[in-house]
Amino acid sequence: MTDDAGVTDAAAHYAPEIDGEPDPGEVVWAWVPYEDDPSQGKDRPVLVLAPDERSAGDGWVGLMLTSQDHDRDAEDEARHGRHWMDVGTGGWDSQGRPSEVRLDRLVRLERAGVRREGAVLDERVFHEVLAARRGLDG
């Protein structure tokens, strides 16, 4: 499910801990459904923002990452309600490619859908992502 219910600014706090469990500030690999056909999707890196307040402690919410560059088509993406932010490189991409995070589509992660931890996002960048998400609302 991909909606904004279930996460608040208070719940989103930087707390990575490489322990096999997703934590805010970590990038994990998880199954993400396609928007146009939620019955299909693919494994992709997801930045964990917070525990999912709806899941009774057994899920998380996050934002998907991509190595595709949306800077060149940012106006078109924004017209379609898609907003991206550069987050740099990290251990989540084995080829070391720069990544972008999609700010406007919150992804719900269930424990069974998380495949593995990928890396930890820099704390400064994590807080910049949160600020950019808040900026979409106003």
Model regions: which residues?
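Conserved functional hotspots at enzyme active or ligand-binding sites that engage polyanionic ligands
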Residues: 1-45, 49-138
